[in-house]
Design a protein with these regions (language model features):
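Short microdomains enriched in Cys/His and/or Lys/Arg
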Residues: 71-104
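Core catalytic machinery and nucleic-acid-binding channels of phosphodiester-processing enzymes
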Residues: 51, 68, 86
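Short metal-coordination and nucleic-acid-contact micro-motifs, chiefly zinc-binding Cys/His arrays
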Residues: 54-60
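N-terminal alpha-helical interaction blocks
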Residues: 1-51
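Conserved His + Asp/Glu catalytic blocks
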Residues: 86, 99-203
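Short, cysteine/histidine-rich loop/knuckle motifs that typically chelate Zn2+
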Residues: 62-66
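Divalent metal-coordination and catalytic microenvironments
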Residues: 55, 94, 151
Length: 203
């Protein structure tokens, strides 16, 4: 329950931002989101599983996004195992970010992110390396500065030879260069990229 309580508190912050962007009916759903939770448990009551809840299903709601992320993580894990075994691929985990923005600029920044990633993914160097990818947008809030940081987490499938073939390997410096070029923002100081281990934990 503590996890849900923490996310519900974040939902209350989210309400202030989203109210002017959605219809009244949708806002009421967001405001009421996960105020009712029904669990099933074993005889000891130690293991509990959520059975039913009144979710708003808004993609940016902290509670709904968290629950969807947990479900997606399981699906991704199974997919990765299958692709590694059947397609002989490996995976890298890429995080792309830009400087924080204020609430009023967040919507435009998300549109800019999508357009920037589209530009980067259309580059020949990207297409030569990437055999498939799953992309997720995450938005974090800095309470002290009252601003937001949207960023992409990208799971990328590559050939096993990617890590040893100098013709195709893209190092961290090159990924940064590609992202700066795509966003047209030279103020970006870092991107994060790492290989996914066989046991599905990141290095």
């Amino acid at each position: 329950m503590d996890k849900y309580t923490n996310k519900k508190l974040r939902n209350q912050v989210f309400q202030k931002f989203i109210e002017r962007h959605v219809k009244k009916e949708q806002f009421y759903l967001i405001e009421d989101c996960n105020t009712f939770l029904s669990f099933v448990a074993d005889k000891t009551l130690e293991k509990q599983k959520l059975y039913k809840a009144n979710s708003c299903r808004n993609r940016f709601c902290p509670v709904c996004a968290w629950r969807k992320a947990r479900k997606d993580a399981l699906g991704l894990s199974l997919m990765m195992q299958y692709i590694k075994q059947e397609e002989s691929k490996e995976f890298i985990f890429l995080t792309l970010t830009t400087p924080n923005v204020k609430a009023e600029a967040l919507e435009d920044e998300i549109k800019h992110y999508n357009a920037s990633f589209r530009r980067m993914s259309n580059r020949k160097i990207f297409k030569d390396v990437v055999k498939g990818y799953v992309r997720k947008l995450e938005i974090t809030y800095n309470k002290k500065r009252d601003d937001y940081n949207p960023h992409f987490h990208v799971l990328i499938a590559v050939n096993k030879s990617y890590f040893t073939d100098k013709r195709y390997y893209i190092n961290q410096k090159k990924w940064l260069e590609l992202w700066r070029s795509a966003t047209k923002d030279e103020s970006i100081t870092q991107v994060h990229v790492q290989k996914i281990k066989q046991n599905n934990n990141k290095e």
